[in-house]
């Protein structure tokens, strides 16, 4: 099964997923979501964002980016936690990566996603002698981690810039909340987190699009990839809809075959943060009422030298979902050395991408055939903006189906509020 951006395959030794037996349930969920007749209908705004995004707000985002570029801003500090930063961080790493030949037009530094004094001080020191701007992202403005970071970076910016308000953008609620009120009082530029879009589904709003534009990522291409993927996932037929097929396969492995863990694997280090975004998406959407697969991640072949032994010979509690690259933009072809000191001449005329692909196939065979670890493999097209948007949409559509198959609300996260309540109590917040 494939789309323009993603091809799925299943290597499930001695197991056949009865996809068609789930068709009635899948159709019911599909039609309920499509008609917005589900109880959680007020959280489905993300479904049509790729086609119906706010073009007036998008133009204002472009204007702000142009202003910052004109003013020679070097770094944009993106402050947020969870869904308020993971999508933007994922896109930034997907397009650029740490050592990419392609460089961002403004560097993004992500803050407010922990409460480490060491880390915050290091980031403040990193930007203090640079021309920097701030994009603070929070629907309420009361989440502790980003609030602390915003206060410290704001204080630093106000010391450096007379007109500091021109270099702060708040992405928040459209009419209420602590951050909205602060931004209004200080005359910061404001962009909106829509009421009908939850944090982990917000990457195609200003939450993700504005940081993308700051970095020089073509956000319209991201939206186009998401729109195209949405179009390709129109069918309610589980055999024709790749996202639903993935959702059914993981549901079957979990509920019928009793696998407890799904490990999201890639052979591309640039996907490390995509895995982090995926983990939040599935953990917060499914982990309720004592239900849900435990989402984990690994980068191969690196983690084969740590986790590989456990996956191969450890308890049979997990299956793998493996995302591999079809068209690398860069490659290396090995040549013979005159003297084969390193004994690598057997790789002569092979490309490094071929070696990586052999590692993938050898590992999948070892894990699935000998280790009895089921594998769901996905081949993604390239590291382009369009593919990025397509992957975002694919997994958001998949997790919605998967959570409803499990019988839980995909769009709330009541468990997250418990630690916040305890923390605020211990800190003496009134």
UniProtKB/Swiss-Prot annotation:
Q: Which domain of life is it from?
A: Bacteria
Q: Record's Gene3D superfamilies?
A: Glucose-6-phosphate isomerase like protein, domain 1
Pathway linked to the protein: Carbohydrate biosynthesis; gluconeogenesis; Carbohydrate degradation; glycolysis; D-glyceraldehyde 3-phosphate and glycerone phosphate from D-glucose: step 2/4
State where the protein is found.
Cytoplasm
Single biological process term from Gene Ontology: gluconeogenesis
Stored CDD domains: SIS_PGI_1, SIS_PGI_2
Please write the reaction equations for the catalytic activity of this protein: alpha-D-glucose 6-phosphate = beta-D-fructose 6-phosphate
Q: What is its EC number?
A: 5.3.1.9
Sorted alphabetically, which InterPro entries does this protein's record hold? G6P_Isomerase, Phosphoglucose_isomerase_CS, SIS_dom_sf, SIS_PGI_1, SIS_PGI_2
Residues the record marks as active site: 284 (proton donor), 305, 420
Which keywords belong to this entry? Answer: Cytoplasm, Gluconeogenesis, Glycolysis, Isomerase
Name the GO cellular-component terms: cytosol
Task: Tell me a Gene Ontology molecular-function term this record carries.
Answer: glucose-6-phosphate isomerase activity
Q: Which family, according to the similarity comment?
A: Belongs to the GPI family.
The function of this protein is:
Catalyzes the reversible isomerization of glucose-6-phosphate to fructose-6-phosphate.
State the protein's name.
Glucose-6-phosphate isomerase
Q: What's the name of its gene?
A: pgi
């Amino acid at each position: 099964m494939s789309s323009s951006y993603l091809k799925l395959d299943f290597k499930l030794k001695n197991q056949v997923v009865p996809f068609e037996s789930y068709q009635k349930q899948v159709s019911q969920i599909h039609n309920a979501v499509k008609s917005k007749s589900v109880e959680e209908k007020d959280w489905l705004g993300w479904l049509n964002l790729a086609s119906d995004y706010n073009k007036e707000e998008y133009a204002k985002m472009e204007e702000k980016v142009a202003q910052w570029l004109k003013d020679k801003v070097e770094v944009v500090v993106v402050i947020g936690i969870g869904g308020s930063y993971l999508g933007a961080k994922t896109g930034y790493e997907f397009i650029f990566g740490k050592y990419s030949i392609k460089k961002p037009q403004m560097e993004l530094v992500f803050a407010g996603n922990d409460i480490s004094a060491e880390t915050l001080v290091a980031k403040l020191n990193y930007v203090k002698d640079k021309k920097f701007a701030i994009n603070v992202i929070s629907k309420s403005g009361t989440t502790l981690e980003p609030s602390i970071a915003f206060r410290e970076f704001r204080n630093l910016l106000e010391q450096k810039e007379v007109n500091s308000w021109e270099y702060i953008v708040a992405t928040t609620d459209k009419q209420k909340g602590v951050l909205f009120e602060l931004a209004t009082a200080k005359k910061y530029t404001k962009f909106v987190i829509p009421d009908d879009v939850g944090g982990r589904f917000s990457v195609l709003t200003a939450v993700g699009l504005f940081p993308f534009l700051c970095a020089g990522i073509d956000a319209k291409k991201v939206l186009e990839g998401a729109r195209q993927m949405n179009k390709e996932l129109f069918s309610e037929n589980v055999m024709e809809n790749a996202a639903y097929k993935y959702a059914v396969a993981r549901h079957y492995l979990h509920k019928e075959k009793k696998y407890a863990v799904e490990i999201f694997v890639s052979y591309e280090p640039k996907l490390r943060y995509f895995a982090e975004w995926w983990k939040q998406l599935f953990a917060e959407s499914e982990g309720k009422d004592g239900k849900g697969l435990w989402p984990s991640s690994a980068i191969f072949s690196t983690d084969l030298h740590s986790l590989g032994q456990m996956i191969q010979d450890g308890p049979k509690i997990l299956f793998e979902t493996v995302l591999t690259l079809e068209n690398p933009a860069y490659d290396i072809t090995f040549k013979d050395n005159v003297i084969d000191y390193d004994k690598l001449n057997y790789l002569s005329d092979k490309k490094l991408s071929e070696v990586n692909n052999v590692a993938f196939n050898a590992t999948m065979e070892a894990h699935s055939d000998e280790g009895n670890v089921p594998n769901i493999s996905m081949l993604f097209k390239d590291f382009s903006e369009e593919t990025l948007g397509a992957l975002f949409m694919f997994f958001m559509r998949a997790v919605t189906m998967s959570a409803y198959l499990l019988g839980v609300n995909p769009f709330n996260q009541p468990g997250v509020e418990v630690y916040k309540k305890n923390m605020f109590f211990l800190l003496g917040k009134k």
